[in-house]
Amino acid sequence: MGETEITCAAGTIVGTVRDNARLFDAIPFLEKAHPFDDPVALKQGLLLDATTPHPNALSVSAPLSARPGTDCPVVVWLSAPAELGDGFVHVHVPHRDGFEGFLPFAADAIGHFRGVADVKLALRWIQRNIEAFGGDPTNVTVVGAGEEAAVALWLCRRDHYAGEFRRVWAASPEFPRAPYEKRKWIVRYLLSAPLTRAKLNELAENRPGRVGRSYRRYAKFFGPMGPQPHDASELAELAVVRVEDALDPGAIAEFAR
């Protein structure tokens, strides 16, 4: 195993070579922020060490032979990546979930969720940088299962879709069971705090375990929080969408080529 470097708009990114692939395990793409703040794209032109995995950074895996102009299909995984065979550039994109990602504030625009916005900025990063890894920015497929499939479909809405990807494979999408307004009282009770950005950021800083524990209790009884309400008639016609029961690696590989 050795090191490898790629220079792109984001900067110079250091990764590793392993199993006939170039691996970049932790590429930061967002500025550091409080848990309930909206995401801000990281400035470009940095020296980035992507040799060690990190949960809040995207990761890229590219064929060892891939170079700018190879134009490999790009698969963006919101769920855990699967093996699709040779010739793909894989990008795993993290996003905030739970209260941090999907608890709405009064000042938020309709349809805006921080967890979705995290992925949106990652997709913009991919458009600007993936060609340096040997990927084709015009041939991007987003894949997600369950809660992540719901995020993928939300990105296909006409008020969100801006051509950053061509296709979506959504496996068993899981949207919230009821409108947030019907659950707001229990969220306030569990957190024991005003449901404002400032107060929840303060809570997350002073009592970091409470937000996570409260969300786990919430999800146990009411299911996951996520973007809502879902209406298939609001999807952009330019996005090719497949809603399936499961993640089928063989079918996804054929779909994404």
Where are these regions (language model features)?
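Non-catalytic accessory segments of hydrolases
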Residues: 1-111, 223, 245-256
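Mature extracellular catalytic domain of secreted serine hydrolases
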Residues: 44-64, 97, 111, 117-120, ...
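Alpha/beta-hydrolase active-site loop
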Residues: 110-132
